[in-house]
């Protein structure tokens, strides 16, 4: 049955009070649902669209330690990210695989500079390292990246990071939460809250597929709606002031023949100072 929607909806009863109701079915909300259900809490998750439909399905698809943050001296952040990379591989080996990256260099100084950075990256990974960084000759770089047209390339470096199916991992979390006893209902929108003595007691839900309304009672409500968090807060308090300052990245999708082969490329610095994967 797992995520069979009619079965999930049939478990919603106006008289029941859930231990926790999670609003938002992206990676964060689904992860919370797994932890809550695994802790023995009666858990309900509400998602207004499809699971992982928003930000969680629009990632870089990379599982990496944040090599670019080394230049900013965010060592603890990189170390933590490398630990999480290893944890993801351990917990979801069916969704996470390694990915070779090549960094082309246009001067020997840059080759040495990037090499030292990747050496530190490998050292921070320690036993969790996925492979050694290797130095590539100019001819090897062009062999591995035949479409590369950069002028003056003197060589490059190859290191290993990871990639994953973000939607696949999110759905795996949803199925795990359901197996642990959580109820997850998608295409259901929160339309308002009811409070008592300043505390939220229940939420009004509208089924996005059939239009019927429901009232959900819970001891705790979790806002896991990501960039829509402020909008949800205004349902509780119309005078709520925005707390988030959303940032936006751009991901472009090309046919595989644009960059043939199985190697990825990292451009450490573009003309406008960006890092491009």
Predicted regions and their residues:
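Glycine-rich Rossmann-fold phosphate-binding loop(s) that bind the pyrophosphate
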Residues: 25-26, 48
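Active-site substrate-recognition segment that forms the wall
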Residues: 35, 46, 94-97, 190, ...
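N-terminal Rossmann-fold NAD(P) dinucleotide-binding loop
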Residues: 29
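Dinucleotide-binding Rossmann-like beta1-alpha1 core, especially the glycine-rich loop
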Residues: 61-144
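Helical element adjacent to the flavin cofactor pocket in flavoenzyme catalytic cores
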Residues: 157-219
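Extreme N-terminal leader/targeting segments of oxidoreductases
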Residues: 1-20, 35-39
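Glycine-rich FAD pyrophosphate-binding loop
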Residues: 37-57
């Amino acid at each position: 049955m797992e995520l069979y929607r009619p079965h999930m909806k049939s478990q919603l009863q106006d008289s029941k009070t859930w231990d926790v109701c999670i609003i938002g079915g992206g990676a964060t909300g689904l992860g919370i649902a797994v932890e809550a259900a695994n802790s023995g809490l009666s858990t309900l998750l509400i998602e207004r669209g499809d699971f992982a439909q928003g930000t969680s399905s629009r990632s870089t698809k990379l599982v990496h330690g944040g090599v670019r943050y080394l230049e900013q001296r965010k060592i603890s952040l990189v170390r933590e990210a490398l630990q999480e990379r290893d944890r993801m591989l351990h917990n979801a080996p069916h969704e996470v695989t390694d990915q070779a990256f090549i960094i082309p260099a246009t001067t020997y100084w840059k080759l040495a500079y990037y090499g030292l950075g990747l050496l530190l990256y490998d050292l921070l990974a320690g036993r969790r390292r996925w492979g050694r960084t290797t130095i590539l000759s100019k001819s090897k770089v062009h062999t591995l990246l035949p479409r590369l047209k950069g002028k003056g390339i003197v060589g490059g470096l190859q290191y290993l990071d990871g990639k994953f199916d973000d939607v696949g991992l999110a759905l795996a979390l949803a199925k795990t939460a359901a197996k642990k006893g959580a109820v997850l209902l998608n295409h259901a929108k929160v339309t308002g809250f009811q409070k008592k003595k300043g505390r939220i007691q229940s939420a009004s839900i509208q089924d996005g597929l059939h239009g019927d309304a429901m009232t959900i009672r819970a001891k705790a409500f979790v806002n896991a709606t990501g960039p829509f968090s402020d909008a949800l807060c205004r349902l509780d308090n119309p005078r709520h002031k925005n707390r988030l300052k959303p940032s936006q990245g751009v991901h472009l999708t090309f046919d595989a023949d644009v960059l043939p082969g199985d190697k990825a490329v990292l451009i450490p610095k573009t003309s406008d100072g960006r890092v491009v994967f």
